[in-house]
């Protein structure tokens, strides 16, 4: 069955590239989630405290890629204890988050985070909320690292390579 989940992993360029390489992911799109303004621009999200998170919309086939596995792969490319910071990127828009549209996904998300927490001394900082809003990012952000292969990314090439084999 095809499903959709929204994941914030810091800068959305790397998150989009990473998730798009995973077998079972059908499509990805970057945008802005769960902020306080409608139809924000990148400049507004970066400079005007809109509350939006840079987020990747992930459509996937859960018969090929169960949500549990998708979340485990997500945890491999973030620091789940870091608040509003991933790699060199800092700000509320770079927070980590799992935004669901299907309430049943909580039955998978919560135990997954409990397992993750056992691996860390610090508390897990991943925000888990129902998706309230998602606005597509500007076209130049879509598939950014495919268009700009040497563009900045906090997720390394090794992670991209392992995503292809996941």
Curated annotation (Swiss-Prot):
Domain of life: Bacteria
GO biological process per UniProt: cellular response to oxidative stress; protein modification process
Sample GO molecular function, one term: peptide-methionine (S)-S-oxide reductase activity
Keyword Cytoplasm attributed: no
Top EC class for this record: oxidoreductase
InterPro entries: Met_Sox_Rdtase_MsrA_dom (IPR002569), Met_Sox_Rdtase_MsrA_sf (IPR036509), MsrA_MetSO_reductase (IPR050162)
Family: Belongs to the MsrA Met sulfoxide reductase family.
Catalytic activity from the UniProt record: L-methionyl-[protein] + [thioredoxin]-disulfide + H2O = L-methionyl-(S)-S-oxide-[protein] + [thioredoxin]-dithiol; [thioredoxin]-disulfide + L-methionine + H2O = L-methionine (S)-S-oxide + [thioredoxin]-dithiol
Coiled coil feature spans: none
EC numbers for this chain: 1.8.4.11
Keywords: Oxidoreductase
Organism: Lachnoclostridium phytofermentans (strain ATCC 700394 / DSM 18823 / ISDg)
Originating gene: msrA
Lineage: Bacteria, Bacillati, Bacillota, Clostridia, Lachnospirales
NCBIfam families: msrA
List of catalytic residues: 11
One Gene Ontology CC term in the entry: cytoplasm
Name by which UniProt lists this protein: Peptide methionine sulfoxide reductase MsrA
General function of this protein: Has an important function as a repair enzyme for proteins that have been inactivated by oxidation. Catalyzes the reversible oxidation-reduction of methionine sulfoxide in proteins to methionine.
């Amino acid at each position: 069955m095809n499903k959709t989940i929204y994941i914030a992993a810091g800068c959305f360029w790397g998150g989009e590239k990473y998730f798009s390489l995973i077998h079972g992911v059908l499509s990805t799109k970057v945008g802005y989630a769960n902020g306080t303004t409608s139809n924000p621009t990148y400049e507004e999200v970066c400079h005007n405290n809109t509350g939006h998170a840079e987020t990747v919309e992930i459509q996937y086939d859960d018969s090929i890629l169960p949500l549990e596995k998708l979340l485990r792969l997500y945890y491999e490319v973030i620091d789940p204890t870091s608040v509003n910071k991933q790699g060199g990127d800092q700000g509320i828009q770079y927070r980590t988050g799992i935004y669901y549209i299907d309430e049943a996904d909580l039955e998978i998300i919560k135990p997954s985070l409990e397992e993750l927490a056992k691996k860390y001394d610090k508390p897990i900082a991943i925000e888990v909320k129902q998706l309230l809003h998602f606005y597509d990012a500007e076209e130049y952000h879509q598939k950014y690292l495919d268009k700009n292969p040497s563009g900045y990314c906090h997720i390394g090439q090794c992670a991209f390579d392992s995503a292809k084999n996941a």
